Design a protein with these regions (language model features):
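Switch I (G2) and immediately adjacent beta-strands of P-loop GTPase domains
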Residues: 1-38, 45, 58-61, 146, ...
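Short, ordered loop/turn segments at secondary-structure junctions
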Residues: 19-22, 33, 44-48, 65, ...
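Residue-level signature of catalytic and energy-coupling elements of molecular machines
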Residues: 16-18, 40, 53, 60, ...
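Canonical P-loop GTPase G-domain recognition
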Residues: 66, 75-136, 201, 291-298
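C-terminal effector/interaction modules appended to NTPase cores
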Residues: 62, 150-299
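Conserved Switch II/interswitch segment of TRAFAC-class P-loop GTPases
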Residues: 13, 23, 34-54, 61-82, ...
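Switch/connector loops and helix/strand junctions flanking conserved nucleotide-binding motifs
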Residues: 50-51, 76-83, 113-117, 180-181, ...
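Active-site phosphate-binding and catalytic loops of NTP-dependent enzymes
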Residues: 12, 25, 50, 90-100, ...
Length: 299
Protein backbone atom coordinates (compact mmCIF):
# COMPACT_ATOMS: atom_id res chain seq x y z
CA UNK A 1 0.00 0.00 0.00
CA UNK A 2 1.03 3.63 -0.41
CA UNK A 3 1.39 5.10 3.05
CA UNK A 4 0.50 8.80 3.25
CA UNK A 5 1.27 10.62 6.48
CA UNK A 6 2.58 13.89 7.92
CA UNK A 7 5.55 14.52 10.19
CA UNK A 8 5.91 17.56 12.45
CA UNK A 9 9.35 19.19 12.26
CA UNK A 10 10.95 22.38 13.56
CA UNK A 11 10.33 23.89 10.12
CA UNK A 12 6.69 22.85 9.81
CA UNK A 13 4.92 19.73 8.58
CA UNK A 14 6.25 17.42 5.87
CA UNK A 15 3.96 15.02 4.03
CA UNK A 16 5.45 11.66 3.06
CA UNK A 17 4.18 9.19 0.46
CA UNK A 18 5.79 5.84 1.22
CA UNK A 19 5.68 3.48 -1.78
CA UNK A 20 6.50 -0.27 -1.67
CA UNK A 21 9.94 -1.32 -2.87
CA UNK A 22 8.97 -4.66 -4.44
CA UNK A 23 9.40 -4.93 -8.21
CA UNK A 24 5.66 -5.60 -8.71
CA UNK A 25 4.77 -2.10 -7.53
CA UNK A 26 6.50 -0.23 -10.35
CA UNK A 27 3.36 1.69 -11.38
CA UNK A 28 2.79 2.78 -7.80
CA UNK A 29 6.31 4.22 -7.56
CA UNK A 30 5.89 6.00 -10.90
CA UNK A 31 2.71 7.69 -9.66
CA UNK A 32 4.44 8.64 -6.42
CA UNK A 33 7.09 10.49 -8.41
CA UNK A 34 4.42 12.29 -10.43
CA UNK A 35 2.52 13.75 -7.46
CA UNK A 36 5.37 14.52 -5.07
CA UNK A 37 7.60 17.60 -4.88
CA UNK A 38 10.79 15.90 -3.70
CA UNK A 39 11.90 12.27 -4.01
CA UNK A 40 13.79 10.83 -1.03
CA UNK A 41 15.72 7.93 -2.55
CA UNK A 42 16.53 5.43 0.21
CA UNK A 43 19.49 3.16 -0.50
CA UNK A 44 20.58 0.46 1.95
CA UNK A 45 24.27 0.85 2.79
CA UNK A 46 24.76 -2.93 2.84
CA UNK A 47 22.91 -3.65 -0.42
CA UNK A 48 23.79 -0.74 -2.68
CA UNK A 49 21.86 0.35 -5.76
CA UNK A 50 19.27 -2.31 -6.61
CA UNK A 51 17.13 -2.64 -9.79
CA UNK A 52 14.21 -0.96 -7.99
CA UNK A 53 16.54 1.88 -7.01
CA UNK A 54 17.49 2.41 -10.65
CA UNK A 55 13.82 2.36 -11.62
CA UNK A 56 12.96 4.93 -8.92
CA UNK A 57 15.74 7.18 -10.24
CA UNK A 58 14.29 6.93 -13.75
CA UNK A 59 10.82 7.83 -12.46
CA UNK A 60 12.17 10.87 -10.61
CA UNK A 61 14.25 12.09 -13.55
CA UNK A 62 11.33 11.55 -15.94
CA UNK A 63 9.01 13.54 -13.67
CA UNK A 64 11.75 16.18 -13.24
CA UNK A 65 11.50 15.92 -9.46
CA UNK A 66 14.62 16.74 -7.38
CA UNK A 67 16.20 13.83 -5.51
CA UNK A 68 17.58 13.67 -1.98
CA UNK A 69 19.59 10.49 -1.36
CA UNK A 70 19.27 8.88 2.07
CA UNK A 71 21.82 6.12 2.64
CA UNK A 72 20.27 3.93 5.33
CA UNK A 73 21.80 1.25 7.61
CA UNK A 74 25.08 3.10 8.07
CA UNK A 75 25.25 1.48 11.52
CA UNK A 76 26.07 -1.86 9.88
CA UNK A 77 29.67 -3.06 9.72
CA UNK A 78 29.50 -3.90 6.01
CA UNK A 79 28.14 -0.48 5.03
CA UNK A 80 29.93 0.74 1.89
CA UNK A 81 28.99 4.37 1.19
CA UNK A 82 31.69 4.96 -1.44
CA UNK A 83 30.41 2.03 -3.48
CA UNK A 84 26.89 3.49 -3.42
CA UNK A 85 28.06 6.95 -4.48
CA UNK A 86 29.94 5.36 -7.38
CA UNK A 87 26.89 3.36 -8.45
CA UNK A 88 24.66 6.44 -8.21
CA UNK A 89 27.04 8.48 -10.35
CA UNK A 90 26.68 5.88 -13.11
CA UNK A 91 22.92 6.54 -13.02
CA UNK A 92 23.33 10.33 -13.45
CA UNK A 93 22.85 11.04 -9.75
CA UNK A 94 25.89 13.07 -8.66
CA UNK A 95 25.94 13.92 -4.97
CA UNK A 96 27.34 17.20 -3.65
CA UNK A 97 30.52 15.55 -2.36
CA UNK A 98 31.14 14.26 -5.88
CA UNK A 99 30.71 17.70 -7.41
CA UNK A 100 27.01 17.35 -8.21
CA UNK A 101 23.94 19.06 -6.81
CA UNK A 102 22.16 16.09 -5.20
CA UNK A 103 21.95 16.21 -1.40
CA UNK A 104 23.09 12.98 0.28
CA UNK A 105 22.40 12.20 3.94
CA UNK A 106 23.68 9.18 5.86
CA UNK A 107 21.02 7.79 8.20
CA UNK A 108 20.19 4.87 10.45
CA UNK A 109 16.57 3.90 11.03
CA UNK A 110 17.76 1.83 14.01
CA UNK A 111 19.79 4.44 15.92
CA UNK A 112 18.07 7.55 14.53
CA UNK A 113 21.38 8.98 13.31
CA UNK A 114 20.99 11.50 10.50
CA UNK A 115 17.17 11.69 10.65
CA UNK A 116 17.15 15.32 11.83
CA UNK A 117 19.61 16.24 9.08
CA UNK A 118 17.38 14.52 6.51
CA UNK A 119 14.31 16.48 7.64
CA UNK A 120 16.34 19.70 7.53
CA UNK A 121 17.52 18.87 4.00
CA UNK A 122 13.92 18.34 2.86
CA UNK A 123 12.86 21.67 4.39
CA UNK A 124 15.83 23.45 2.77
CA UNK A 125 15.06 21.95 -0.63
CA UNK A 126 11.41 23.01 -0.36
CA UNK A 127 12.49 26.59 0.42
CA UNK A 128 14.83 26.64 -2.57
CA UNK A 129 12.06 25.33 -4.82
CA UNK A 130 9.61 27.85 -3.29
CA UNK A 131 6.94 25.19 -2.94
CA UNK A 132 3.59 26.85 -2.35
CA UNK A 133 -0.09 26.02 -2.85
CA UNK A 134 -3.30 27.98 -2.52
CA UNK A 135 -5.44 27.22 0.52
CA UNK A 136 -8.46 28.93 -1.02
CA UNK A 137 -11.24 27.76 -3.29
CA UNK A 138 -12.33 24.30 -4.38
CA UNK A 139 -10.12 21.36 -3.51
CA UNK A 140 -8.02 19.57 -6.09
CA UNK A 141 -6.32 16.33 -5.13
CA UNK A 142 -5.05 12.96 -6.32
CA UNK A 143 -6.19 9.50 -5.23
CA UNK A 144 -3.24 7.54 -3.86
CA UNK A 145 -5.25 4.49 -2.78
CA UNK A 146 -8.84 3.23 -2.68
CA UNK A 147 -10.71 0.29 -1.21
CA UNK A 148 -14.12 -1.05 -0.22
CA UNK A 149 -14.85 -1.05 3.51
CA UNK A 150 -17.68 -3.24 4.84
CA UNK A 151 -18.88 -0.57 7.23
CA UNK A 152 -18.01 2.63 5.34
CA UNK A 153 -18.48 1.57 1.73
CA UNK A 154 -16.11 2.91 -0.98
CA UNK A 155 -13.24 4.88 0.55
CA UNK A 156 -10.35 6.77 -1.03
CA UNK A 157 -7.08 8.11 0.32
CA UNK A 158 -6.55 11.49 -1.33
CA UNK A 159 -3.63 13.90 -1.23
CA UNK A 160 -5.02 17.43 -1.38
CA UNK A 161 -2.86 19.56 -3.70
CA UNK A 162 -4.67 22.89 -3.52
CA UNK A 163 -7.80 24.45 -2.06
CA UNK A 164 -9.81 23.20 0.91
CA UNK A 165 -11.88 20.01 1.06
CA UNK A 166 -14.73 20.23 3.53
CA UNK A 167 -17.02 17.62 4.98
CA UNK A 168 -20.31 17.52 2.96
CA UNK A 169 -18.63 18.93 -0.18
CA UNK A 170 -19.73 17.36 -3.46
CA UNK A 171 -16.79 15.74 -5.22
CA UNK A 172 -15.98 14.34 -8.64
CA UNK A 173 -13.30 11.62 -8.55
CA UNK A 174 -12.59 10.08 -11.93
CA UNK A 175 -15.88 8.48 -12.98
CA UNK A 176 -17.11 8.35 -9.38
CA UNK A 177 -18.94 11.08 -7.51
CA UNK A 178 -20.50 11.72 -4.12
CA UNK A 179 -20.79 13.95 -1.12
CA UNK A 180 -18.06 13.71 1.51
CA UNK A 181 -19.80 11.90 4.36
CA UNK A 182 -16.75 11.72 6.60
CA UNK A 183 -13.01 12.49 6.48
CA UNK A 184 -10.22 10.88 8.48
CA UNK A 185 -6.53 11.69 8.93
CA UNK A 186 -3.72 9.12 8.95
CA UNK A 187 -4.44 8.35 12.62
CA UNK A 188 -8.07 7.50 11.75
CA UNK A 189 -9.30 10.59 13.61
CA UNK A 190 -12.32 12.26 12.00
CA UNK A 191 -11.69 15.79 10.69
CA UNK A 192 -13.90 18.42 9.07
CA UNK A 193 -11.54 19.92 6.49
CA UNK A 194 -8.23 19.29 4.75
CA UNK A 195 -5.91 21.74 2.99
CA UNK A 196 -2.87 21.50 0.68
CA UNK A 197 -0.44 18.60 1.28
CA UNK A 198 -2.84 16.91 3.69
CA UNK A 199 -3.50 13.19 3.09
CA UNK A 200 -7.09 12.34 3.95
CA UNK A 201 -9.40 9.32 3.74
CA UNK A 202 -12.89 10.17 2.48
CA UNK A 203 -16.18 8.26 2.42
CA UNK A 204 -19.45 8.88 0.59
CA UNK A 205 -18.41 8.02 -2.97
CA UNK A 206 -20.55 6.17 -5.51
CA UNK A 207 -17.80 3.59 -6.05
CA UNK A 208 -14.09 2.95 -5.60
CA UNK A 209 -12.10 5.35 -7.82
CA UNK A 210 -8.96 4.34 -9.63
CA UNK A 211 -5.59 5.17 -8.17
CA UNK A 212 -4.26 8.44 -9.68
CA UNK A 213 -7.79 9.75 -10.38
CA UNK A 214 -8.15 13.48 -9.77
CA UNK A 215 -10.55 14.80 -7.12
CA UNK A 216 -12.35 18.11 -7.60
CA UNK A 217 -14.77 19.55 -5.05
CA UNK A 218 -17.79 21.70 -5.86
CA UNK A 219 -21.19 22.73 -4.53
CA UNK A 220 -23.00 21.72 -7.73
CA UNK A 221 -24.44 18.22 -7.26
CA UNK A 222 -26.12 18.10 -10.68
CA UNK A 223 -22.92 18.95 -12.55
CA UNK A 224 -20.92 16.35 -10.61
CA UNK A 225 -23.39 13.57 -11.47
CA UNK A 226 -23.55 14.65 -15.12
CA UNK A 227 -19.77 14.63 -15.63
CA UNK A 228 -19.37 11.33 -13.75
CA UNK A 229 -22.01 9.72 -16.00
CA UNK A 230 -20.26 10.95 -19.15
CA UNK A 231 -16.90 9.64 -17.91
CA UNK A 232 -18.37 6.22 -17.08
CA UNK A 233 -19.92 5.95 -20.56
CA UNK A 234 -16.60 6.91 -22.14
CA UNK A 235 -14.72 4.31 -20.09
CA UNK A 236 -17.18 1.57 -21.07
CA UNK A 237 -16.70 2.54 -24.71
CA UNK A 238 -12.91 2.32 -24.37
CA UNK A 239 -13.16 -1.07 -22.62
CA UNK A 240 -15.43 -2.40 -25.37
CA UNK A 241 -13.01 -1.26 -28.09
CA UNK A 242 -10.14 -2.89 -26.20
CA UNK A 243 -12.04 -6.20 -25.96
CA UNK A 244 -12.85 -6.11 -29.67
CA UNK A 245 -9.19 -5.50 -30.49
CA UNK A 246 -8.11 -8.38 -28.25
CA UNK A 247 -10.73 -10.65 -29.85
CA UNK A 248 -9.40 -9.82 -33.33
CA UNK A 249 -5.81 -10.58 -32.31
CA UNK A 250 -6.90 -13.86 -30.70
CA UNK A 251 -8.69 -14.89 -33.91
CA UNK A 252 -5.57 -14.06 -35.93
CA UNK A 253 -3.54 -16.33 -33.67
CA UNK A 254 -6.26 -18.99 -33.40
CA UNK A 255 -4.22 -21.77 -35.05
CA UNK A 256 -1.34 -21.51 -32.61
CA UNK A 257 -3.63 -20.87 -29.66
CA UNK A 258 -6.10 -23.69 -30.39
CA UNK A 259 -4.36 -26.14 -28.09
CA UNK A 260 -3.51 -23.55 -25.45
CA UNK A 261 -5.36 -23.87 -22.15
CA UNK A 262 -6.85 -20.59 -20.90
CA UNK A 263 -7.35 -19.97 -17.19
CA UNK A 264 -9.98 -17.35 -16.37
CA UNK A 265 -9.15 -15.24 -13.32
CA UNK A 266 -10.99 -12.79 -11.11
CA UNK A 267 -8.60 -10.68 -9.03
CA UNK A 268 -9.97 -9.10 -5.85
CA UNK A 269 -7.67 -7.44 -3.33
CA UNK A 270 -7.90 -5.20 -0.28
CA UNK A 271 -6.89 -2.04 -2.17
CA UNK A 272 -6.65 -0.92 -5.83
CA UNK A 273 -2.87 -0.61 -5.76
CA UNK A 274 -2.39 -4.26 -4.77
CA UNK A 275 -4.83 -5.42 -7.44
CA UNK A 276 -2.90 -3.47 -10.06
CA UNK A 277 0.41 -4.98 -8.92
CA UNK A 278 -0.99 -8.54 -9.03
CA UNK A 279 -2.38 -8.05 -12.54
CA UNK A 280 0.93 -6.58 -13.72
CA UNK A 281 2.87 -9.55 -12.31
CA UNK A 282 0.50 -12.11 -13.84
CA UNK A 283 0.65 -10.47 -17.28
CA UNK A 284 4.44 -10.73 -17.17
CA UNK A 285 4.19 -14.53 -16.95
CA UNK A 286 4.69 -16.13 -20.38
CA UNK A 287 3.83 -19.77 -21.06
CA UNK A 288 3.39 -21.62 -24.37
CA UNK A 289 0.87 -24.10 -22.98
CA UNK A 290 -1.25 -22.00 -20.62
CA UNK A 291 -2.67 -18.49 -20.98
CA UNK A 292 -4.43 -16.18 -18.54
CA UNK A 293 -7.63 -14.22 -19.10
CA UNK A 294 -8.23 -11.70 -16.33
CA UNK A 295 -12.00 -11.21 -16.40
CA UNK A 296 -12.11 -8.69 -13.56
CA UNK A 297 -9.69 -6.98 -11.22
CA UNK A 298 -10.47 -4.63 -8.36
CA UNK A 299 -11.41 -4.46 -4.69
Amino acid sequence: HIGAYQVDTNNGKITFLDTPGHAAFSSMRARGAQITDIVVLIVAADDGVMPQTEEAIEHALSAKVPIIVAINKIDKENADVDKILTELSKKNVLTEEWGGDTICIRVSAVTGEGIDQLLEAISLQSEILELKASAKGSAIGTVVESSLDKGKGPIATVLIESGILNKKDYVLVGKEFGRVRAMFNEFNNEINLAGPSVPVVITGLSGTPNVADKLISTNDERKVKEIASLRESKQKEIEMQSKQKTFSIDNFNSDSAASKKIINLIIKSDVQGSSEAIVSSLKAIKNDDVGLDIIYSGV
